Each structure stands twice: as structure tokens, then as C-alpha cells.
Amino acid sequence: EGVGHTAQGGDELMPLRSDPLPRMAGHLSFMRAQSKEICKVRAGDLAVLGLPFEDTSAPYAGQSLAPRALRETSVYFGWHANPQFSHPVDIDARQDIKTDGLHERLCDLGDIAPGSEEAIHAALMTATCQINRVGACALLLGGSDRLSVTVQNALQGCQTVQLGGTPCDARDFHIAPLPNGSATICNSDTAAQLAGFSQWRDASKPLFVRFDLSVFETSLSALCDRPRLGGCNLDTVTQWLSTLGQHRVSAIMLTGLNPTRPGMGVVKVGQRLMVTALL
């Protein structure tokens, strides 16, 4: 009855997607990015690096599969956004999007190899330093609080913006953090927070963005290990990412995705696509 009412009301309905979804075989890359060795990363590049490791402090195992899950699902988004195809459209809104320069800058460095904890942190430190040294931005798929400290150490004197997650450092700028019993809940007035961010930001320092899926309201965080009451809606997160995108960002770490959590497959794919589109 509700569907019939919507149709009769004259609202514009989203057209059904008739194009076949791609079936990829072999090596997957994020957004169909070109594979590249780290020594060939150039200034202005967005260098994707996977961190397929479990966060032992997280409530559930499965985060190690997040980089692969994002690469697999981002193929669908990249298939529509890649300028080599004739129909670059947003997969949900069906609106034209501009991808000029994206695929020239986007490159996939693969994953950091499994090993001892010391070796993993050393490899992440070296990679982050090298990417930052040439003036590129590191997009880290996966991570943890401890791995984020390694990134901060690599970006000496950096400022950190944290979307979601549990506050760790009062000097960081927190957007919709998870309540931990002692932290003050951030003002929900987005305009006031944006003004506060402008005052907090020091352009002379590197900027590190920690993007945890717990930033989203519960209805959008089905795959997050730490579901929450409240949180931001999609428009608010998009607004924040657009604001951050106006600054020179040295590294972005995406955490909180656990593709093994039970739930409907369509919800899982939808959330991965949403995160891919936002990034």
C-alpha cells in the first residue's frame, strides 16, 4: 500500500539498474585504481594501502577482511565512475559525477604483509613517511588505535580529526565520538562544530583523519563493531568529509568495518558502497 501511494503521489522513482554488475577475476584494486609500487608514488597521488589485521581490543574478529571487502565492493562503484566507460553516474542518485583527475591520482599499493606486530608497525611507519614525503595522501583501509598512533608518529606534529570511535586524546578534534563514560559528548550543532574546526586547524601541521564507521547513526552502521545510539546521518558525514577535503590531508584511516558480522547481504554491500562513495 505504501509503495502504491508513493507511485500515485507523483514522486520520482529511482529507475531500476539494468546494466549488468561486473564480475572481476584475479587481482582486485580499490576503485579499479592502477597498481603502483610505493617508490613511484607522486605528489598529489591518493595512495591506497590495506591493513588486513585484527584489532585485538575490538569486540569481534573479522576486521582483517575489511580491505578486501572494500576493494571487492568498490569495483561496482568504480565501474560506474571510471571515465573509460560512457556512463559515469552515481550508483544510487543516478546523477552525473565528475571524475576528472581521480583515476590519474588514485593508486593501490596493495596490503602490508602479515608478520610480527613490530614488523607491521615498522612497515606502516616506513610507508606513511614515504608517502607523505613526496606530498601524497595515504588512504589506509583498516587499522586500529595502536596502528593510528604509528601513523601519528610518522606524521610528526600532525593534528588528528576523529569521526566516531572512542576519544583517545583531548588534543584531537572529535566528531560524534562514542561515549566512554568520561568524555564530553560533542555539540550536535554542525555549524558550530564546523566553526570550531576552522579555529582548531593549524594549516602548518599535517592533517590525519580517522574515519570510524561508528560515526554513523545506528540505522546506517549495521557492519560496525560498535553500534551506537545516535550518531550522524549520511548528509552530516558528507558535509564533514567535504569540509576536510578542502584541507590538505596527509593520511586517512578507515576503521570499524567488519564484513563478517551477521546481516542481510544487501545491507552489507550497500554500506560498503556508501563508504566507498564517501571516500
Residue ranges of model-derived segments:
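Short, hydrophobic/glycine-enriched beta-strand segments
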Residues: 45-51, 161-162
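Mid-sequence, gly/pro-rich, charge-dense loop/helix-turn segments that line enzyme active sites
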Residues: 160-185
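Catalytic cores of soluble, metal-dependent hydrolases
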Residues: 4-47, 60-61, 65-138, 146-154, ...
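Gly/Ser/Thr-rich helix-start
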Residues: 51, 143-144
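Generic enzyme active-site microenvironment
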Residues: 143, 162-164, 210-212
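Glycine-rich phosphate/pyrophosphate-binding beta-alpha loops
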Residues: 57
